[in-house]
């Protein structure tokens, strides 16, 4: 698994700005108000050919309000889960008691992890001189950087990636299919895994996963080796509910990063909730296969029309994620558990298929004959041919006279046609339009 680098420090020292620079994102909210990054963000990053994950956290502080307590717990959780820590301070505001507390905490409780002490907002030689006072933290080799301008960040990242262990959880290169069991707390993830594997006689091995206390279980189904990434069973160390929720979310994000297909469990009695949608969207945005499993279906009073009505209601709520298949299961009665695994295997098979260019262009010509694109500003979009680009998920490239002439409704039309024609249910894919 990719190493995890956590950015920690008190509020408003520039963690989100550094996060955005490292990941080339603009997703984290950057504001001058202390503590504005209320939640965490995890994004993939790459430096000199080495891939890793970066986590942006809320600020470390001691205020008595609930948000600050939650942010403190999230910071401690992030430090515990991280492989490498970048500890940020602000040269302009000087050394504070919170900085000293964090330094003491890192040296006392997390001295087994690489910690890079970064003095941020150093935009002039004078500020670099003032930054020398930060050696009082006990970190005698500070890195002087400007996350805003980028100065010093490259040298810092060189050191960070050099610290990654050669075997820092790199996934074994094999042909196994990785399925992540994810969902909100108490939707039945543990019951699902126990019911699925409790009577399975083809288990190859159980071994500790790379996410600390998670268990990766290998088993075979119809001749295919499967790695089940289980995110159930939170550790009992979190001191407050917010910490438990944060830890759950962290494990979910890391499981999604590792998997081929995400099996998202929801509670049939509770229905599709906002947090369920966030988890589904997270998997879809990462271009993972997605299968929605409605657990505890045995508790629902039903007739022959119930599942259809239930599905229709969920698809209404899911909006443009209506391409995700739904299955009804019961971990308690073991109903449809292996059917769900088979569906996930089918999704991965479709996700990894490579369609020939000749087949794609026959499809394209038929599509253009039936429904050619409309003109825009008096100009006509002419799509010449298409091909599939090799990637972990399907990526289709269209070569045309001017990509700016493409209208959103026609792009959605092509997406729908491709999904139907190539049976991409549960499979996110990308369309790219290039000028030629």
From Swiss-Prot:
GTP 2 binds at residues 183-190, 230-234, 295-298. InterPro entries: G_ENGA, GTP-bd, GTPase_Der, KH_dom-like, KH_dom-like_a/b, P-loop_NTPase, Small_GTP-bd. It holds the Pfam family KH_dom-like. GTP 1 binds at residues 9-16, 56-60, 120-123. Transmembrane segments: none annotated. Residues 353-436 form the KH-like domain. GO terms for molecular function: GTP binding; ribosome binding. One of its GO terms (biological process) is ribosome biogenesis. Keywords: GTP-binding, Nucleotide-binding, Repeat, Ribosome biogenesis. Residues 3-168, 177-352 form the EngA-type G domain. Belongs to the TRAFAC class TrmE-Era-EngA-EngB-Septin-like GTPase superfamily. EngA (Der) GTPase family. NCBIfam families: GTPase_EngA, small_GTP. Associates with the 50S ribosomal subunit. GTPase that plays an essential role in the late steps of ribosome biogenesis. This is GTPase Der. It comes from Prosthecochloris aestuarii (strain DSM 271 / SK 413).
């Amino acid at each position: 698994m990719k190493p995890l680098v956590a950015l920690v420090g008190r509020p408003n020292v520039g963690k989100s700005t550094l996060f955005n620079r490292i990941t080339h994102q603009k997703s984290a909210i950057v504001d001058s108000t202390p503590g504005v990054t209320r939640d965490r963000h995890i994004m993939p990053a790459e430096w000199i050919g080495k891939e890793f994950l970066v986590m942006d956290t809320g600020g470390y502080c001691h205020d008595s309000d609930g948000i600050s307590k939650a942010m403190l717990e999230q910071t401690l959780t992030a430090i515990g889960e991280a492989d490498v820590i970048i500890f940020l301070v602000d040269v302009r505001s000087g050394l504070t008691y919170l900085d000293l507390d964090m330094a003491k905490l890192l040296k006392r409780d997390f001295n087994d992890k690489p910690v890079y002490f970064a003095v941020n907002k150093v935009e002039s030689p004078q500020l670099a001189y003032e930054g020398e006072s930060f050696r009082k933290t006990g970190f005698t080799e500070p890195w002087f950087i400007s996350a805003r301008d980028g100065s010093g960040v490259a040298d810092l990242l060189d050191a960070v990636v050099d610290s990654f262990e050669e075997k820092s959880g790199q996934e074994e290169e094999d042909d196994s299919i990785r399925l992540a069991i994810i969902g909100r707390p108490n939707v039945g993830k543990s019951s699902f895994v126990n019911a699925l594997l409790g009577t399975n006689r083809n288990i190859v091995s159980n071994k500790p996963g790379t996410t600390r206390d998670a268990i990766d279980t290998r088993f075979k189904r119809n001749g295919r080796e499967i790695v089940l990434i289980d995110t159930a069973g939170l550790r009992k160390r979190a001191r407050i509910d917010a910490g438990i929720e944060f830890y759950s979310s962290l494990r979910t994000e890391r499981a999604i990063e590792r998997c081929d297909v995400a099996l998202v469990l929801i509670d049939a009695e509770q229905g599709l909730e906002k947090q369920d949608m966030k988890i589904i969207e997270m998997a879809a945005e990462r271009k993972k296969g997605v299968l929605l499993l409605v657990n505890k279906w045995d508790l629902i009073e039903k007739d022959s029309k119930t599942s259809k009505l239930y599905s229709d209601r969920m698809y209404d709520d899911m909006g443009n994620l209506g391409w995700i298949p739904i299955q009804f299961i019961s971990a308690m009665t073991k109903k449809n558990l292996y059917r769900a695994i088979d569906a996930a295997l089918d999704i991965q098979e479709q996700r990894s298929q490579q369609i020939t260019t000749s087949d794609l262009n026959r499809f394209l010509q038929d599509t253009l004959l039936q429904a050619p694109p409309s003109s825009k500003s008096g100009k006509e979009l002419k799509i010449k041919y298409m091909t599939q680009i090799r990637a972990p998920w399907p990526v289709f490239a269209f070569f045309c006279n001017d990509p700016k002439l493409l209208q959103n409704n026609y792009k959605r039309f092509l997406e729908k046609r491709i999904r139907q024609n190539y049976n991409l249910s549960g499979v996110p894919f990308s369309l790219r339009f290039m000028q030629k």
